[in-house]
Amino acid sequence: MSSVNLSKRIKELRNKYKITQDRLAKKADIPFSTLAKIEAGYTPNPSMETLIRIADAFGVGVDELLGRK
């Protein structure tokens, strides 16, 4: 998945669940700057651990986070 698609997908999920970047970063236990860079497309290949943390914060699987479901 490209960083643009991941960025778009995270934004879609944040809007769906009505959660701010700050709240998502805290819930996922990742630095706000990391999440902001992923959403802006500046981090093309976030680690699997980061993807899992973000997916868990949304209560979805990594496949759904990546738009595969």
Question: What are these model-derived regions, one by one?
Answer:
Residues 11, 36-37, 66:
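Key DNA-contacting residues within the recognition helix of helix-turn-helix
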Residues 1-16:
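A short, Lys/Arg-rich alpha-helix, primarily the initiator
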Residues 49-64:
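DNA major-groove recognition helix of helix-turn-helix/homeodomain DNA-binding modules
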Residues 15, 26, 56:
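Alpha-helical residues within the helix-turn-helix
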Residues 19-37:
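Short alpha-helical DNA-recognition segment
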Residues 41, 68:
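Conserved short acidic donor-positioning loop in nucleotide-sugar-dependent glycosyltransferases
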